[in-house]
């Protein structure tokens, strides 16, 4: 999904045409290279002796090789049309002929997104795909993988919403008209793991809702639904006329898990408008200080930043200057400025100092930001409503007009 958001941002910024195409029974259109034999299906009344084995000629749904064979078949077709996979993401295909306008194709199994300013080339590629495979031209991109996509070409922006999917979830669990909540988690709510010797409910609405068996979290799960009820009209705005500039924020919450004393880390990246990449995770071990937790968060963000740089380079938007990664811990910044041995940090594995290494290479610039302005803070802890809403606005989430949602 990160590649999709980055592609949509770049396409909106350049005012590209965005179209989509869907393949019918995609796995049946692949080519099978292995020799596979089947037993005769039960109930088949053909004139075959008992114990006859059948040779499978084409991939079928349920065959382990089917997804790979379909991807190889599609990749061969796109290569014949002049496209090659991106080095950053093999599901993104780039036009190899640099004398022609840029043309990008994003593949997710049997759903394709086309992004280009070459309308003639777009029509040609779609017609060739329809000649070689069973597929349907869906026209301009309106929805993709559960996302509703609305364009404002005058402002060169794209708004992503999931109001239809949210309403389906709320209706499924009977929360369509529930009391809304401004935040997904209360700052006063402390969640703990279920004791191993306590019996759990194996069926009912809670396992169906969150996919696990911790009944004491039911109130928190219901609060998430009420939060979705209050934010179903929000959308993520991408694109814009401002230059594409990669900027990131990273943050950590030290030892915030009361049961394990482990820390939470999070990051977010934007290209000038809404966030295109984000992540929230829990450390795999106990960390000794808030500085150490911030170093872990910085390393995680630096890995994503380096990959985003590769992806943007393939899309023709290489960073013109080192991308800035904002953090709110001055001790972590001091350690990354000077490579020195410290008694309290010498045990930290070198791989977690990736942010320092990239800064020394000139591929990244670390900068300080106050905690109240660090957007990644929303991924590390529950916040009061005013702070939560402020960070959501900084992430690019804005209210969407009702007529756009209905369309």
Residue ranges and their predicted role:
Residues 213, 248-291:
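RNase H-like nuclease fold core
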Residues 1-106, 111-134:
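Metal/cofactor- and membrane transport-associated sequence elements
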Residues 245, 281-407:
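RNase H-like nuclease module associated with reverse transcription
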Residues 7-8, 138-235, 370, 378-380:
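C-terminal reverse transcriptase regions that engage the nucleic-acid substrate
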Residues 23-31, 112, 252-260, 331-333:
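Short acidic, Gly/Ser-rich segments with clustered Asp/Glu that frequently serve as metal-coordination loops
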Residues 81, 85-88, 113-166, 170-171, ...:
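Polymerase palm active-site segment centered on the conserved acidic dipeptide of motif C
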Residues 7, 22, 38, 62, ...:
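Mobile genetic element proteins and their domesticated derivatives, centered on retroelements
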Residues 11-15, 226-252, 317-319:
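Structured nucleic-acid-interacting core domains from mobile-element enzymes and related host factors
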């Amino acid at each position: 999904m990160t590649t999709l958001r980055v592609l949509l941002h770049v396409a909106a910024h350049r005012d590209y045409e965005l179209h989509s195409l869907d393949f019918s029974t995609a796995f049946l259109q692949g080519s099978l290279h292995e020799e596979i034999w089947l037993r005769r299906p039960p109930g088949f009344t053909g004139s075959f002796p008992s114990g006859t084995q059948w040779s499978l000629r084409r991939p079928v749904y349920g065959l382990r090789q089917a997804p790979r064979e379909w991807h190889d078949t599609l990749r061969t077709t796109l290569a014949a049309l002049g496209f090659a996979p991106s080095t950053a993401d093999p599901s993104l295909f780039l036009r190899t002929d640099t004398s022609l306008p840029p043309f990008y194709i994003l593949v997710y199994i049997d759903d394709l997104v086309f992004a280009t300013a070459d309308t003639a080339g777009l029509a040609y590629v779609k017609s060739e795909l329809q000649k070689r495979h069973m597929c349907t031209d869906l026209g301009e991109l309106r929805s993709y993988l559960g996302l509703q996509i609305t364009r404002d070409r005058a402002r060169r922006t794209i708004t992503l919403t999931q109001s239809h999917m949210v309403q389906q979830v709320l209706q499924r669990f009977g929360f369509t008209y529930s009391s809304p909540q401004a935040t997904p988690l209360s700052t006063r709510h402390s969640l703990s793991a279920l004791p191993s010797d306590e019996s759990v409910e194996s069926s009912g609405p809670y396992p169906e809702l969150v996919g696990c068996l911790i009944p004491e979290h039911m109130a928190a799960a219901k609060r998430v639904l009420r939060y979705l009820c209050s934010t179903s009209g929000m959308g993520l705005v991408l694109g814009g006329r401002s230059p594409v500039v990669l900027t990131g924020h990273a943050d950590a919450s030290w030892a915030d898990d009361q049961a394990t004393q482990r820390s939470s880390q999070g990051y977010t990246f934007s290209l000038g408008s809404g966030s295109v990449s984000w992540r929230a995770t829990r450390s795999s071990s106990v960390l000794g200080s808030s500085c150490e937790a911030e170093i872990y968060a910085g390393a995680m963000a630096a890995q994503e930043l380096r990959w985003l740089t590769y992806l943007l380079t393939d899309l023709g938007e290489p960073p013109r200057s080192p991308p800035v990664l904002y953090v709110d811990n001055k001790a972590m910044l001091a350690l990354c400025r000077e490579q020195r041995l410290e008694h309290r940090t010498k045990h930290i594995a070198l791989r977690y100092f990736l942010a320092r290494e990239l800064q020394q290479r000139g591929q990244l610039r670390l900068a300080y930001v106050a905690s109240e302005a660090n957007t990644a803070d929303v991924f590390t802890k529950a916040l009061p409503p005013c702070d939560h809403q402020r960070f959501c606005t900084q992430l690019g989430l804005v209210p969407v007009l009702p007529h756009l949602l209905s369309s």
